């Protein structure tokens, strides 16, 4: 049986590897609101797609120049649907992440393997220890609009652990608090030392 780091990280030791699972940060009332928002937003998008696909011509319009009015509405619908698609993608992905997402980390004798998965589907990326440099907590900037936007509940959130791999920053640990992040980094460093001695 493994140990827990904070409330969201479970670990399990095996003979030649250690596995870590990071669960999403769940806040019940926010998850309910996000679900309602996604359902409402999806309904609005479906109505707009119907109008774009020809429903606008079935509307009875009282105006002097009906064709100009309909052309203006088509432009509005196309612009609206462009924004709608972007936010629909972001919110549905976030909702699926909160409900079914996990981060899997496997530490073995040679490498750290990281996988972000929703319903078990995701891409695993292997990082060899010899190529990993400077694992440290992400330094947040509370005055950054981009970071505020990224950490809104309807978005996936910022990763808490940063490391350098072949001169590129890589990261994992979505929405971990500072204390848990430091404990996770220490845990990983300690386990890597033990596993590398077993070579």
Give the positions of each predicted feature:
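A signal for specific C-terminal beta-sheet/loop modules enriched in small/flexible residues
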Residues: 34-44, 122-137, 183-192
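Cytosol-/stroma-facing membrane-proximal "stalk/adaptor" domains immediately downstream
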Residues: 173-199
